[in-house]
Amino acid sequence: MASSTNSTVEPEDHAMADAPTNGVGHNHHPAGLREYREGVAPLSTDDIDAAMDEAESPSETVEALKLMRRRGMLPTGCCYDDRMKLHANADFGPTPHHPEDPRRIEEIMKMFKRAGLIFTGPDTELLDILKENPTKYMWRIPAREATKQEICTVHTPGHYDWVENLSHLSTRDLRALSMTLDQGRASLYVGGMSYEAALLSAGGCIETCKNVAAGNVKNAFAVIRPPGHHAEYDSAMGFCFFNNVPIGARVCQQEYPETCRKVFILDWDVHHGNGVQNMFYDDPNVLYTSLHVYANGEFYPGKPDNPMIPDGDLDKVGDGPGKGKNVNIAWPSQGMGDGEYLAAFQKIVMPIAKEFNPDLVIISAGFDAADGDELGGCFVTPPCYAHMTHMLMSLAGGKVAVCLEGGYNLQAISHSALAVARTLMGEPPPKMDMPPISKEAARVLARVQAAQAPYWECMRPGIIDIQRVGNDASRLHDVIRGYQRQVLSEKHGMFPLFIQREALFRSFENQVLITPDVQTKQKILFIIHDP
């Protein structure tokens, strides 16, 4: 087992009972966790801020960060803790592995290590290396247990207490509870270490987001579990206990009110992040955009039992001051791939995000839409994940925190995560041709545009243009405008004004009509209206 002198705690092939504490102090010391000596561990954001404020000889770690800040070059952060693997199913049924498998995070870290993204030598050597080349390796961000106060920024105290109580149940009770919960919409298993792992997952997300928001790293990847985006404010569901990303967003907004006011959460997990949506549904300062399979509410998480609670359909745009801050790109079926996701980014995600102009971007990075994931049934490739990440890095001054959500094929999740991490570290995304987009997906994007048009200038007709699908397909917008042109021509002799700029011609074709005498009349009447 790698000791705390390594740049991050690295997974190796041995029993989960040997999971280290990662050299990080924590609030709760559950039985069965071994204590490891502390080495030269990286500092938390609170440690760094405190040391930065002290005039007397800050540590070598802080000096290295200050040097990298002055040079304008910061490393990419990586948060990981082996103890999160201790969350395991208490129901030892005939199925060998539950989809939300502890090996998910281990495989990602092994992939990072094999690819040379993680430094495996002493921290003292890493400091010297990063002083010379800050982007060569990922900077270790230690995970810690989230506090009850932090978790209750988005959850009820009653829900926190319910999760905490899991650590006091007997194995028999946990097994019975798992058998009851692991079905239907609840879809949750529990174990003796679920509470501790959930605290670390939430705390790891918080520290990742804070390090990015504070400028200690340029961006970061939190390799954490259990995931969070299905957890509601008062209940656990969908493999999720605490909703990590909203907790991280709220803590950053509270601790950095001047520099982290607006947060953009992009969720590319194949399942709708119902919990994230509901926590920010009326919040004007958090933009939540989700790309997910909806399938008329038949795909998980489906429709809530309470019809008053919004689901993942594309007409759910937010409420009150939060209208327009909830964007659901709800695919009609599985089978979506690179073409659909890149089109969604180019036509919907990025235009709205740029208009929102966030201070921090958090990616709820589920990789179950990846090619090879049996549960997701979609075909998004690692190069596509790299391109989507690269586009998001153009926002918020590059402050992007990637937090793991779902993804259940070990090979697909590790390769997809590697593509994202390499992009965060500055490697250009691989060249890709724009794949074709299905007619069904094009219709969804057009409907999303229409649903969001009242709230975003970039979504209004003429500003955004959904591409044609195939040589024999026409946009409904073009058909309607062509008919309007014919009527105006027959009744008033009007004809279209030629637009010379090629970039504008397609979007505004047949939209600017004039009468033949426009150049000879002294008075001109302009009529401007929606199509």
Question: What residue spans do the PLM features occupy?
Answer:
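Catalytic cores of soluble, metal-dependent hydrolases
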Residues: 2-67, 73, 191, 203, ...
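Metal-dependent C-N hydrolase catalytic cores
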Residues: 3, 10-18, 22-256, 260
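Well-ordered, non-membrane alpha-helical segments in soluble/globular domains
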Residues: 98-108, 381-388, 531
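Intrinsically disordered, low-complexity regions enriched in proline, serine, glycine
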Residues: 120-122, 164, 232, 299-301, ...
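Conserved alpha-helical scaffold segments that buttress catalytic/binding sites
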Residues: 206, 210, 221-373, 377-382, ...
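Proline-centered loop/turn at the N-terminus of a beta-strand
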Residues: 219, 262, 287, 399-401, ...
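A structural signal for the main folded, soluble domain(s) of proteins
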Residues: 511-516, 521
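Short beta-strand element of the alpha/beta-hydrolase
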Residues: 522-529
